[in-house]
């Protein structure tokens, strides 16, 4: 694995120059984009005033590098490789340039499409869609992940994401194929996940819960459903760590011409009860929702849908966190990932079938997105992380 500077074509350089500011070499906000096909993590500096990007370098991580997360102290980037041997890399973030360098590698038990950390910075949470499991790895005091899994839990079908609440006491994971959100309590003494009571909450059948986001005030949990494009809003009981459904709001308008998606069939040797019937694909265009994000002030929430390649905007009511769908925007083709910068002023979107990233300015009163620019990116762009250093 190596860190190299980009050699851009003349046209790409011209586009970058035109769409970005001159680029401040002392920029303190860095954008990281994993490009699964290329096996690279692209690094950009972001202009804090305009949101424009300057591509700095690319780290050769390995084929199928996909989910990433940043350490609590912002010194490390953890990147998961979904090609064999399955592994997670600990990468040092150069505070001056944003460039990455490998510090450690640890084995993973399966192909993991999701990774996150808790506020303590001592645990790495992963979820395996194909392996129907979640796994927890320890993070050393030096921020490195060097040991194997501390805990592995077999789940229902298609574990797709796993996140901690803002306190680190509770952890939630989605099972897309089983239509449930799992609820855990983190034992502070052992660092192990324990099933909460109840251990799960069901969505409506066929919804396919995918990605989870927790509101900044820790009162609400929002789950994007891949197969129907709903955002399910749950109230979080912070005394018990349990969820209760408040509402379910569509992110895909009826006139989009999409039909509900279909969950994959259960594997032959599965560790949980599988439905008897398997729905056949009728060839109609399907909802294929992907990612969800919320601004740091909790006022605006965004989701992506990959079949139509659009970003949806919701306004979030103060206090109770209820959602109002506002509109949607065209974006990069097959937008698997979005990320909002820590200031809440800019949104970055990637498309798995696009060779460009899009940056949007977020109107601070309405949440409306205005394009800032499009920037070259390696093939198979998916996951995005943004780091602002003090």
Give names to the regions the model predicted:
Residues 40-41, 85-88, 132-134, 179-181, ...:
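Structural signal for beta-propeller blades
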Residues 45-51, 91-98, 137-144, 184-193, ...:
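Short loop/turn segments immediately following beta-strands, especially the blade-tip
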Residues 54-60, 101-106, 148-153, 196-202, ...:
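A short beta-strand motif characteristic of beta-propeller blades
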Residues 55-121:
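Blade-loop segments of beta-propeller domains
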Residues 62-73, 108-123, 152-170, 203-220, ...:
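Beta-rich, blade/repeat-based domains predominating
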Residues 173-231:
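Loop-centered beta-sheet repeat module
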